[in-house]
Amino acid sequence: QKCTMTSLCAVNPRWKAGKVPGCAYLESWHCDITEFLELRKNTGDDRRRTHDMNTANWIPDLFMKRMEKRGKWTLFRSNDVPDLHDLYGKRFEEAYENYEIKAEKGEIWSHTIKAIDLWKQMLKMLFETGHPWITFKDTCNVRSPQDHVGIIHSSNLCTEITLNTGEDETAVCNLGSVVLDSHLASDGTLDHDKLKETIKIAVRALDNVIDVNFYPTEAAKRSNLRHRPIGMGVMGLQNALYMKNIPFASQKAVEFNDEFMEAICYYAYEASSELAKERGVYKSYCGSKWDRGILPQDTVETLEEERGESISVPKSSKMDWKVVRDKIAKYGMRNSNVIAIAPTATISNIMGSSPCIEPT
């Protein structure tokens, strides 16, 4: 990790926007996890610290189950369990438990700790340093629209995108964000016509970027041209709530959040499908969840089936999704990924708006 951070720092003088962004992810079963958690601490041996690199936990559901039951958690060396990196859900659980049996027999190295103790350490470091961030491996993979062509091994610097990566492909995503407070009518309601037109233009523009972009590696170019992911996000939620005279921490704010995000998703999916009619579907479309008629909101049920328990999230909708579903079934999708809520810390200042969906 220290070598990676040093490489990032070496590029900093050429990065006009500030420090070069970078983030390292580590799975919770890795034998170095306890040291990894302390990489951003301001105390201790500085040779074991990475002050200029972000860190994130990549947590499987099995760890959370063990933690809730106050059970044990086994750490392994990655070279002893090479397939765990590429497994998730029930297949991961089966393989992990088989490795635990091998470890008990002394066939491979292991170290056993209490799952609750590791979880407490994760939270302690998060409160003290803001790192490592908490991300969930199984949720990202089970709900991925591209589950037919690879595995998601991490998110990105800001945890807003989850794309497949591998030795031959480096995930790349082109991001853009709608200024929400510019899409309210004079009476404070959401201007659907304006929002639809903005998103239609933005999706086309982001798709164009894929073809004209500069790629530092062939793996990045190969991935982007094959899957064509884009990330439509939003900024200005706090400004919009202020204009509507709605407190940020209120039920009305939650309801408005559901309303505008449903609209953004609706118009973005529709725009990508219409673009597919014009330009063709992305190369790896066949076999994807889009191709199978499964939209992102449908994957909550997929995750419930995987976990064998209900997930308490609102599942109602206000818009006629049959229209979008029919278009996708007929024309397909131009982009494998469409929505991503980026932090917009810099561009929101340029636009004179509040950052993403956060209060300021």
Protein language model features and the residues they cover:
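Internal maturation/activation junctions in enzymes
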Residues: 198-221, 247-344
